Amino acid sequence: MKLKTTPKKEENVARGKRAKRKGNNYERLIAKIFGDKYKVELKRTPQSGGFAKKSEKADDFRGDITIVDNKQVLLLHIECKNQKNWQLKQWIEQAEEDCPEGRTPIVVFHKHNSSKDYVCLSLEDFTELVPKSKVVGKRVFKK
């Protein structure tokens, strides 16, 4: 016997699938941006075995982005958020709680369809990652 679903329930299921697809696409985009910038192959972390990797270490599959080369380790724990309503506190908590030892938790986010991408990380992690040469420079005086 087939159970009938209400139109509202079907609509919620469809909305959930669209949201999941939207999130997956954003994760792929962020993996490509980071990979292109740092010359390393990154992929969206598989949620259900969609991406096979030789390394079976659980830490490799935390966060939304993983490195393909099992001889390397991604030192950032990246959570990607592509949502209309920002919940920064919860996102940061998720990134920090899920982050493996020795890695830096970051949240990459933007408001769906309406803003630039941003990165959020603790001040302590920021000062560790960004070298002095990118913060302080020599002033050039015109003659």
Which residues make up each language-model segment?
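Catalytic phosphate/metal-binding cores of nucleic-acid and nucleotide-processing enzymes, i.e., regions
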Residues: 1-143
